[in-house]
Amino acid sequence: MMNIFTKREGLVLRESFSSIQTPHSTSNVLWIDLLHPSPAEVSYISQIFHLDIPTKEEREEIEQSARYWEDSESITINTYFLVSLFASTNKKDLHNETVTFLLCKDILFTIRYGEFRTFDEIQNKVLASPKNFQNGYDILSKIFEIRVEQDADMLENTAKDTRGLRSGVFGNQFGYDELLENLSRLQELNMRIRDSLFDKRRAITALLKTDKADIEVKKNLTIVLKDLNSLVEFTTVNMNALDNIQSLFSSQINIEQNKTIKIFTVATVGFMPPTLIASIYGMNFDVMPELHWEWGYPLTLCLMVISTMIPILYFKKKKWL
């Protein structure tokens, strides 16, 4: 699907694909948003605007030169946008989707294969306040601003869930399986947010060095960059909190294991004396006079009980139990 935004008589209009198929129809184009574009759409846009649109393989490369490059006429940016639901426990719903931004002759081209609330919001803003968007750089700057705000909201929700998980550990509100699942989910989400923030910070840092963007755009991007730096630091704090929960979880497991081992150890030591007594009288030699005593059997049982109680009472006195 292709959304085309053109500027006419002080207004921004959303138009169809046919609006750029006539001669000189591209002069008023402000932004072309390609959502799940077909090969034919990509090819047509490349030809009519003389663009070198990166392939899917090029979009997913992680080296710096593949995430941002600039020539005399255009700027290409590939950056991560996180696709996730806050409460989702299905890891398949959690991933970073690469969005491509192309800036050429003050026109913004976006190529994306995922639906983001960011783009719905920016489209409404562009249509409602056309004076604030004179060229593609203004739109790109606003997209980054909106997206970083949404990343901040997502990070705040992650931090809230982290605090709840920590309280649950101390309150024994979770079983081990549930706790481990929630911990893994939050660690994964925090890592994905961090990757997304790092990628945007790298793109904006490079964009601030270009001479193609005007001063106002750079001022806005500088503010966004400061917010990004704060959020990156927050992800570090959140990751440390999650690591602390993991340490508490591991310590709790060790304590439970030690308690179990202690019980078995006490039981083993406690039953050693009666076992020894039973073994002695189980030999059944004729020369063992106790075997022929009338009270030999009950006395032996009493002796076994007493020999069991003595080590247990000793352990309690030493506060080992």
UniProtKB/Swiss-Prot annotation:
Coiled-coil region: none
Transmembrane intervals: 263-283, 295-315
Reactions performed catalytically: Mg(2+)(in) = Mg(2+)(out)
Entry's localization field: Cell inner membrane
Sites annotated Essential for ion permeation: N258
Gene3D superfamilies: CorA soluble domain-like, Magnesium transport protein CorA, transmembrane region
Membrane topology category: Multi-pass membrane protein
GO-annotated cellular components: plasma membrane
Renumbered ranges of motif Probable selectivity filter: 282-284
Subunit structure, as described in the record: Homopentamer. In the absence of Mg(2+), interactions between subunits are weakened, and dimers, trimers and tetramers can be observed in vitro.
Family of the protein in this entry: Belongs to the CorA metal ion transporter (MIT) (TC 1.A.35) family.
Domain description: The central ion permeation pathway is formed by the first transmembrane domain from each of the five subunits. Mg(2+) binding strengthens interactions between subunits and leads to the formation of a symmetrical homopentamer surrounding a closed ion permeation pathway. Low Mg(2+) concentrations trigger both a conformation change within each subunit and a loosening of the interactions between subunits. This results in an open ion conduction pathway. In addition, this results in a less symmetrical shape of the whole complex.
Cross-referenced PANTHER family: MAGNESIUM TRANSPORT PROTEIN CORA
Protein name per Swiss-Prot or TrEMBL: Magnesium transport protein CorA
Gene: corA
